A protein has these predicted regions:
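Conserved beta-strand->loop/alpha-helix structural units within folded catalytic cores of enzymes
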Residues: 1, 19-20, 51, 203
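Short, well-ordered alpha-helices that flank and scaffold nucleotide-derived cofactor binding pockets
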Residues: 2-6, 198
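Glycine-rich FAD pyrophosphate-binding loop
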Residues: 5-32
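Conserved FAD-binding subdomain of flavin-dependent enzymes
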Residues: 36-75
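Active-site rim elements
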Residues: 40-46, 116-120, 178-187
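Amphipathic alpha-helical segments that form well-ordered structural scaffolds
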Residues: 53-60, 128, 132, 145, ...
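Rossmann-like flavin
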Residues: 63-167
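Helical element adjacent to the flavin cofactor pocket in flavoenzyme catalytic cores
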Residues: 167-241
């Protein structure tokens, strides 16, 4: 929606965003209150060096607290002033901080990792991480840090693991402190989703929450032209050209 409004000069009044939940944001949603607490189900592991599209888009979105600045400026200024620096990436069962300055790889792990990064993604379909790496890999400091940072399991998709490796390769030298992770001033719902929502609303975009689409009617013919939306509450909306 933001690209349509900003780059294509699309009339925002003709954009309707439907959300089945009662709160916007998808996996970056956030809800709650000071009294009852907040629930934020997920967030993006932002990185200044590699999230070019994200930073470019949010240079166009004004900050809610500092409208003269963009969201990109607000986030990067905050992160530079308050960089991430974890001192206890891994602890043992006795709450002792472990030394993670070494990745813990052996030569077989290094060879498998190099081979993975050089292998085309189409060859990795239907493979798990455990299919590629030997048992020793899953006992390394690297695996424990990477797993807990990105929620990987041994049975997770191998090509998804490879994508994360390529995207976050800059984190290798600093994964023991997470210094490369870009922090937002507040949770990402408040620092990212709400400013974007405000920008879209200012340009006429309409949001409807609690709306689940269960079926779509299409016009006859080879072209895919939707003519109506059906919702879980039994209502239907006809679509116009």
């Amino acid at each position: 929606a933001a690209y349509l409004v900003r780059d294509a000069n699309f009339d925002g009044h003709n954009i309707h965003i439907l959300e089945s939940m009662d709160v916007l944001g998808g996996s970056n949603d956030g809800a709650g209150s000071v009294q009852q607490g907040f629930v934020c189900r997920g967030g993006r592991m932002l990185n200044e060096e590699t999230y070019e599209n994200f930073w470019e888009l949010f240079r166009s979105i004004p900050s809610l607290e500092q409208p003269q600045r963009s969201v990109t400026e607000e986030i990067l200024n905050f992160d530079h002033a308050h960089p991430t620096c974890a001192h206890a990436r891994l602890i043992d069962k006795d709450a002792k901080i472990l030394d993670v300055r070494s990745m813990g790889f052996d030569n077989a792990d290094r060879l498998a990792m190099t081979k993975l990064l050089l292998t085309p993604e189409e060859r990795l379909d239907n493979m798990t991480i455990e299919d590629w790496f030997g048992p020793h890999f899953f006992e390394t400091n690297f695996w424990y840090m990477w797993q807990t940072t990105f929620a990987f399991q041994k049975w997770s998709s191998l090509f998804e693991f490879r994508r994360y490796m390529n995207r976050m390769i800059f984190e290798f030298p600093r994964i023991e402190t997470l210094e490369g992770v870009t922090r937002t001033p507040y949770n990402q719902y408040e620092s990212v989703i709400l400013p974007l929502k405000a920008y879209l609303e200012t340009n006429g975009v309409r949001f409807e929450t609690g709306r689940t689409v269960t079926d779509i009617d299409f016009a006859p013919g080879e072209a895919l032209t939707a003519t109506a939306l059906h919702f879980s509450d039994g209502c239907a909306v006809d679509l116009r050209e």
